[in-house]
Structure formats: structure tokens, C-alpha cells
């Protein structure tokens, strides 16, 4: 209650979780859907609205399950699709386990509710049975898209994350109880999801797609987030074994589930085997940009078995750090300030959690792997005049500035996730590199207020006074000379001071992950402008990319 910034973080977490807290246990349990609706990453990636005919591409369709469940809204004309009552149709197809089976559903419900007369020419307009609405040779997969971007992401998964965060910042056991209900129901059904065999449409094609509920890259992030959430609420949920077992065992009996949920051990087994062990057994479904998959598996193993598997987890983490920092502190993936930031941001995320377990862990890592420090120096050394990064590979757009540090995201409302500001300060204490403090300070709008935005960190007044000492001594401008990242093959020549600073860069290799084939690519920043702008992320050439 002492600090306004802390109250703000806590209150925001509570506000986000409130809608799920207000739901009945039965309604919460009902949120998780089965796998039998063909899922898709786009309604029609290069398509238009069937009503107003205006372009509605890629991810522009609006899903708001709280206000309009089982509907998408056109952002141009505000019409909602599908036009049939899919919620009623969906429920009519439930089997004895509470899972939708299309062959059991009442197809007499497949009509435009605004035009119920079969003789009306609009009687079937906009009607989707789960496999899309077809007209004039085109298919709009409204429900397949909604299931992921509405129901799963905004109802089920968001509920797990928000409830667990609220529990972490309040200690109120009601949040842990509600989160456990969601996690348990996900545990019932998660192993039955396989994006590749259940539609798996991405850009209107299915070949090569992988995933779980979502496609591979999001599936990887989603299951790791659920592991963090489960870890947060574990003790609070376990303490409510009688209430949880009473409700979940009743549901198990009513829906003829194999796990009776009679005890916390049953519930724990259902969550851990259904979500996390299943993920470990199907790595291909979450295979993503390095090191996201390895990191996800590490987090799952740590959550399930720490500290008994401490040595194995630390060995896996060391392997991740070694590979992620092998190329001048980076993984070697191109796309500077974009894809290349995946590795350092991943390292920061996992290290924030590990330092909570052992405050001396970061020093041990830097002593053993000095390249870990370079992972966060790289995006300092290659940033030009605090506004630009060289356009190397798939990144950015023509002439667009990079106003923020790209090595990780400085978010002031991290709530239960830990603070990147605290992490950078700890890294400074280990390395004595003042540029880390300067970046942290500038990322906080060049002010001390609110630092370190960490509900679980040290006294903020002491933290701020220490940051002030560094800034008073070093200033806010990071003094950088010319650099040559020989392994990453990027050189930057710098000259001038203040408003006359300028930088000439050359990328002297080609290809690589998210790299381009334009060897010896050059650029020049001066007078606040990119005077030799690269085109940035190239045209993809398919779907609705523009």
C-alpha cells in the first residue's frame, strides 16, 4: 500500500482477473472447447467481408467472446458472423464427455437467425457449421478462427494467466481455485488437440502446419505461460483440495471422465500429464524459433520436478545459453531488432525466474559464460543515436525508427512475471557495465519514478538511489565508438557528437535464418534520418500481407 506504482500493478492484475472470478464454477469449466472444430489461423487471409465487400485481411476480424461469444465482427461495417446461432448448434453436438461432435449436432439450427424463413434468399447467408461459410467459390472460416483468437486465447488461456497473476500479487486463494478449475479442464482435453490433423489452416493451406490448439509458434508460448501459471497457483490450489475435489469429482462423474478427481493428487496428475507431460512427448507441435522450444521444455521440467532435477535443468540451461550467445552474444539469427531479439529476450525471461530461486545464479552464469553479458550488449552496441538499428534481414519497414532497446521488452506492469528493470540492475552489479543502467533508465522515460516496477524486488527507494548514482556519474548518453561484430558480420563506423552524430554500417555476409541474400548491404544514419533506407521486411508474396 506504500507505493502508488505497486498499487497500480496489483489493481490492474485484479481488474483483469475479475471477469473470471465472477463466473460460476460450472461456467468456468464449460469454457474449454473440444478439438473437433477445424481450426484456422485466418478467416481468409487475403479476403473481404461477405457483407460490405471491403478488404478484411489477416488478423483484422474482431473477436470479443465476452460481449459476442461465437461471433466475429467486421472492422469495416461492424456486421457479425456467422449469422447462425453457433453456440446453440455447438451445444447440441455434445457427447457424454461434454465435447462437440459435428455428426451429433442439430443441423436444423444452421440458418441465418435474422432470416428464419427458408424461402428467404438470405436464409443461409453467413452460416458456418464449423467448417466455414462458402459463397461464390470462397470460404470464410469464421468459427475456426474464432475458436483460437476468441474462445481459446481471450477466454480460456487469458483466464489462466490473469487468475494466476492476481493470485500471485494478492495471495487471495479464490484466484488459485478458479485457475485450477480452468487448468484441470484444459488437462482433460489438451492431449486431444493436434493442429496439423484438425484443420490446421494457415494462409488457406494445411501442409506442413503443426501445433496444439494454436499453430506452432503460439502453441510454444501458450504452454510455457500455462506452466508459469500452474507454478504460481500450485500451493494456493492444493490448499483448497476439499472444495476443488468436490466440484471436479462431480464434473468427472457427470461427464464420465477417466480421472475421478477425488483428491488433489488426481487433479495434479490430470493437469501435469494432460498439459505438460503431453507437451514434452510432442515436441514437434511446439517447435519454434530458437531457443523458445528448448526454453519451454526447460520451464516445464523445472515446474514439474525442481529441485530433484536441478542438475539436469541447469545443464539444459547452460546448453541454451551457449547456443543462444555463440555469435557475438547472439544466436546468429538475422532480422536485427526483430527475429534476432528472440534469443536475448528468452534468456532474460528465464534468468528472471532463475534469479528468484538463487540470487547468486546470475553471477555464476556470467562467470561461466561471459557471452551472456554480450547478449544484452549487442543491441546496445548496434543501436545508432538511440533511434536506429541497421536493417539486416527480415525486420522493420522502410525508414522506420527503432525508439526502444531491442534486447528485451521493458514493461512496467510485469506483475507476476518479474521485472526486466531488476534483471538489468542485477546484470550491472555482476558486470559493472553502466550502459545497462543507462538503457534501463532511458526505457523508464528517463526518470526514476516507479523503478524497478517489481512487486517482489528490493526496496524501490534504495534501488532508485543506486540508479541515480550511476546516471549522475555516467550521464544518459551511451558513448559508443565504432564496432565490428565479426561473427555476426556487421560493422558500424561512428563519428560526430550530439546532433551531428552519424553512423555508417555494412552487413558483410548474406543468408542465414531470416537473413537476406544482399551481401555487402550498407546504410547511413545522420541528421536524425535514415539516408540509405533498406526496404526492411520484404513482401511475403502470399496471404494478406501488404
Predicted regions and their residues:
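Active/binding-pocket-proximal capping segment
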Residues: 316-320, 539
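Histidine-acidic residue clusters that define the catalytic metal-binding segment
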Residues: 321-331
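Short sequence/structural elements of tandem HEAT/ARM alpha-solenoid repeats
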Residues: 311-315
Amino acid at each position: 500500500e506504500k507505493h502508488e506504482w505497486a498499487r497500480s500493478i496489483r489493481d490492474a492484475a485484479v481488474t483483469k482477473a475479475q471477469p473470471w472470478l465472477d463466473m460460476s464454477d460450472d461456467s468456468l469449466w464449460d469454457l474449454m472447447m473440444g478439438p473437433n472444430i477445424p481450426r484456422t489461423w485466418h478467416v481468409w487471409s487475403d479476403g473481404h467481408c461477405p457483407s460490405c465487400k471491403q478488404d478484411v485481411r489477416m488478423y483484422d476480424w474482431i473477436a470479443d467472446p465476452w460481449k459476442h461469444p461465437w461471433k466475429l465482427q467486421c472492422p469495416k461495417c461492424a456486421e457479425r458472423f456467422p449469422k447462425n446461432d453457433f453456440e446453440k448448434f455447438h451445444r447440441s453436438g455434445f457427447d457424454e464427455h461434454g465435447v462437440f461432435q459435428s455428426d451429433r449436432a442439430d443441423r436444423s439450427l444452421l440458418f441465418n437467425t435474422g432470416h428464419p424463413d427458408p424461402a428467404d434468399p438470405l436464409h443461409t447467408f453467413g452460416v458456418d457449421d464449423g467448417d466455414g461459410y462458402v459463397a461464390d467459390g470462397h470460404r470464410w472460416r469464421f468459427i475456426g478462427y474464432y475458436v483460437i483468437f476468441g474462445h481459446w486465447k481471450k477466454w480460456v488461456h487469458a483466464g489462466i494467466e490473469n487468475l494466476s497473476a492476481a493470485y500471485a500479487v494478492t495471495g487471495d486463494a479464490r484466484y488459485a481455485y478458479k485457475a485450477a478449475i480452468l487448468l484441470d479442464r484444459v488437462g482433460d482435453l489438451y492431449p486431444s488437440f493436434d493442429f496439423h490433423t484438425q484443420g490446421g489452416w494457415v494462409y488457406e493451406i494445411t501442409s506442413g502446419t503443426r501445433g496444439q490448439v494454436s499453430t506452432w509458434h503460439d502453441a510454444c508460448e501458450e504452454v510455457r505461460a500455462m506452466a508459469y501459471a500452474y507454478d504460481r497457483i500450485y500451493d494456493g490450489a492444493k490448499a483448497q483440495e476439499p472444495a476443488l475435489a468436490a466440484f471436479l469429482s462431480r464434473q468427472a462423474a457427470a461427464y464420465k471422465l477417466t480421472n475421478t478427481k477425488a483428491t488433489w493428487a488426481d487433479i495434479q496428475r490430470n493437469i501435469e500429464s494432460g498439459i505438460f507431460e503431453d507437451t514434452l512427448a510432442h515436441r514437434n507441435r511446439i517447435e519454434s524459433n530458437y531457443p523458445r522450444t528448448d526454453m519451454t521444455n526447460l520451464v516445464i521440467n523445472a515446474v514439474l520436478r525442481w529441485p530433484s532435477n536441478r542438475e539436469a535443468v541447469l545443464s539444459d540451461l547452460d546448453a541454451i545459453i551457449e547456443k543462444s550467445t555463440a555469435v557475438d552474444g547472439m544466436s546468429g539469427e538475422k532480422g536485427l531488432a526483430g527475429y534476432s531479439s528472440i534469443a536475448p529476450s528468452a534468456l532474460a525471461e528465464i534468468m528472471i525466474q532463475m534469479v528468484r530461486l538463487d540470487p547468486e545464479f546470475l553471477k555464476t552464469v556470467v562467470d561461466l559464460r561471459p557471452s551472456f553479458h554480450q547478449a544484452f550488449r549487442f543491441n546496445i552496441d548496434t543501436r545508432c543515436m538511440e533511434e536506429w538499428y541497421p536493417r539486416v534481414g527480415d525486420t522493420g519497414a522502410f525508414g522506420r525508427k527503432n525508439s526502444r532497446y531491442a534486447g528485451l521488452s521493458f514493461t512496467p506492469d510485469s506483475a507476476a512475471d518479474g521485472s526486466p528493470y531488476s534483471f538489468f540492475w542485477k546484470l550491472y552489479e555482476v558486470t559493472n557495465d553502466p550502459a545497462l543502467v543507462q538503457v534501463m533508465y532511458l526505457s523508464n522515460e528517463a526518470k526514476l519514478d516507479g523503478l524497478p516496477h517489481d512487486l517482489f524486488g528490493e526496496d524501490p527507494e534504495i534501488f532508485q538511489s543506486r540508479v541515480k548514482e550511476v546516471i549522475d556519474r555516467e550521464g544518459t548518453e551511451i558513448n559508443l565508438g565504432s564496432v565490428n561484430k565479426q561473427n555476426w558480420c556487421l560493422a558500424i563506423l561512428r563519428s560526430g557528437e550530439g546532433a551531428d552524430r552519424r553512423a555508417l554500417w555494412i552487413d558483410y555476409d548474406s543468408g542465414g535464418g531470416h537473413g537476406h541474400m544482399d551481401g555487402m548491404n550498407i546504410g547511413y544514419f545522420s541528421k536524425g534520418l535514415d539516408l540509405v533506407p533498406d526496404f526492411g521486411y520484404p513482401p511475403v508474396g502470399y496471404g494478406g500481407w501488404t
